Amino acid sequence: MTQAAIDYNKLKSAPVHLDAYIKSIDSESKEGVVKIRGFANTISKDRAGDVIPASAWKTSNALTNYMKNPIILFGHDHRRPIGKCIDLNPTEMGLEIECEINESSDPAIFSLIKNGVLKTFSIGFRCLDAEWDEATDIFIIKDLELYEVSVVSVPCNQDSTFNLAKSMNGHDYTEWRKSFTAISSKAVPAQERNLSELEKLAIALGYVKE
């Protein structure tokens, strides 16, 4: 199986988290509520080399289920709802969002958002269809289902495997890493392969078997 096929299967089998930024905060809204606006996702290439074109947000699967219960979470934690989405608007630039964050849900997080310390959105979604563009080495996500929108403290790491680790549970991540390593040339030592430092460390510590 090629690396492209492995990455495609990863997209199809696990929730994915991508980031964008909060662009405005309205602190003059009703007491105990702050309204935030921005892009939950943009059409730009993300750190993992994936792109969600504007057309993907207009499919019948993309937003229907989420809008039945448009909760905003903190840090992708389903136990920490902090507000609700009041408007989602697919545009040519990406998925524009407007939310109300409630102070009563988490006063500390509310304060950090209101004071501009927390200013990043992240979405969790399931990829339903994608294609790999060999010329640009990116995955174009053509159809998806939005699971949730979160306010997060730190955007996804540049290392795509770290991004994947956050979007899978520990067992699934370990199994994926094993299958990833199995694709590599068995006759070539880890030190001589084109591996990231994270991959070499995982092999050295025994988390991934050669």
Curated annotation (Swiss-Prot):
Keywords: Hydrolase, Late protein, Protease, Serine protease, Viral capsid assembly, Viral capsid maturation, Viral release from host cell, Virion. It is found in: Virion. Cleaves itself autocatalytically to yield the mature form of the protease. One of its GO terms (biological process) is proteolysis. One of its GO terms (cellular component) is virion component. GO terms for molecular function: peptidase activity; serine-type peptidase activity. Changing residue 122 to A: Complete loss of protease activity. The record marks 23-24, 166-167 as: Cleavage. Residues 1-23, 167-210 form a propeptide. Its EC number is 3.4.21.-. The active site is at residues 76, 122, 148. Serine protease involved in capsid assembly and maturation. Cleaves the major capsid protein, the decoration protein, the portal protein to yield mature procapsids competent for DNA packaging. Acts as a trigger for assembly of the capsid protein. Belongs to the HK97 prohead protease protein family. This is Prohead protease. It comes from Escherichia phage T5 (Enterobacteria phage T5). The lineage of its organism: Viruses, Duplodnaviria, Heunggongvirae, Uroviricota, Caudoviricetes.
